[in-house]
Design a protein with these regions (language model features):
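Active-site beta-strand/loop signature of hydrolases that rely on acidic residues for catalysis
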Residues: 3-7, 21-52, 99, 135, ...
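Active-site environment of divalent metal-dependent phosphoester hydrolases
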Residues: 11-13, 36-39, 81-83, 153-157, ...
C-alpha cells in the first residue's frame, strides 16, 4: 500500500500541487488544511485573521476529486467561516480529507474532535478547533487502520507541550484505540504541530507506534516556504504489523510549506 500524508496549506501552491497529487500514485492520501467552498464563483479567495492574510484555493476539495477520479473521498471540517473576495464574504469549510482508492474497502471509520468543538462562525476561537479521522481499511489481504490528525496551533507556546496538547494526544489515541483490533497494521500521521521530543509522540508510542520521521534521521518536515526556526511538525508513526518497504520525507517538488510524507508498505 502506498500512503501519502500532507498538510496541503489550503492549496496555496495549487499549480505545483495538483499535477503532483494526480501523478504520485498513492492508494491512500491523508490531507490536512483542505478548503471546501460550495458554490464559490472564484478560484481564489482570501483567509483573513487580523494581519494574517493568506490566499486559499476556494474549490480545492472539488479539484482534488477531479484529479483523483479513482478514489473515494471523506471530508471532515474542523470549522467553517468566511473567506473573502474584496469586501464580499463567502462561507467556506476547512479541515481534513482522506482519499482512498476505490479498490480498497473502507470497513470502519471514526472521526472526532481532539481539541475544541466544531464552530460554524469564524472557524472557532484560537487555538482553533482540531479534529482527527481514523479509517479501517482492507488492503493487501489484511486490515489496516489509518489515522490522521491536524494538531492545534498555539501562537503563545509555539510547538512546545501544553496541557491542551496533552489532552489532544489522549483523544487522538482513544480514537485509534477504539477502532483498531489486535493484529491490525496501524498508521498514524499528520501535521501534529509539535516538536520531536513532544509528549504527543510518547503517548502514541504507548499504542505500539514508532515514528519514521525522527527514526529515519530526517532533518525536518518543512519546506523553504516556512521561515520560522522549528523544522519539524509532521510525523508518520507505524506499529510492528506495518511492513515498511520505503519511507521518505519528500523535499522536491515543493507543493506546500510542509513536506509530503510517503510510505510504501
Amino acid at each position: 500500500m502506498r500512503l501519502l500524508c500532507l498538510n496541503a496549506w489550503g492549496g496555496v501552491l495549487h499549480e505545483a500541487l495538483m499535477p503532483w497529487i494526480a501523478g504520485v500514485g498513492a492508494d491512500v492520501l491523508c490531507l490536512q488544511e483542505v478548503v471546501h467552498t460550495p458554490g464559490a464563483g472564484k478560484d481564489w479567495l482570501e483567509y483573513r485573521d487580523g494581519a494574517h492574510v493568506l490566499p486559499q484555493r476556494a474549490r480545492m476539495l472539488d479539484e482534488l476529486r477531479a484529479v483523483l477520479p479513482g478514489h473515494a473521498v471523506l471530508f471532515s471540517p474542523a470549522g467553517s467561516g468566511l473567506l473573502w473576495e474584496g469586501d464580499q464574504a463567502v462561507p467556506s469549510h476547512f479541515g481534513l480529507a482522506c482519499f482512498v482508492r476505490e479498490t480498497i474497502p473502507v470497513i470502519g471509520q471514526a472521526t472526532g474532535f481532539v481539541h475544541g468543538a466544531y464552530s460554524d462562525h469564524d472557524y472557532g476561537a484560537h487555538p482553533r478547533p482540531r479534529n482527527a479521522m481514523v479509517l479501517r481499511l482492507w488492503a493487501e489481504g489484511r486490515p489496516w487502520v489509518v489515522a490522521q490528525m491536524h494538531g492545534l496551533r498555539d501562537k503563545a507556546a509555539g510547538k512546545a507541550d501544553t496541557p491542551e496538547r496533552a489532552a489532544q494526544a489522549e483523544r487522538f489515541a482513544a480514537l485509534i484505540d477504539g477502532l483498531a483490533e489486535p493484529g491490525d497494521a496501524v498508521v498514524a500521521c499528520g501535521d501534529f504541530n509539535v516538536r520531536p521530543d513532544s509528549q504527543t509522540l510518547r503517548r502514541l508510542e504507548r499504542l505500539g507506534l514508532s515514528d519514521l520521521v525522527t527514526g529515519g534521521g530526517f532533518a525536518g518536515t518543512r519546506t523553504a516556504r516556512y521561515t520560522k526556526p522549528d523544522r519539524f511538525a509532521d510525523y508518520l508513526m507505524v506499529n510492528a504489523q506495518v511492513p515498511v518497504r520505503r519511507f521518505e520525507v519528500i523535499r522536491a517538488p515543493e507543493v506546500s510549506d510542509h513536506c509530503p510524507l510517503w510510505l510504501e508498505a
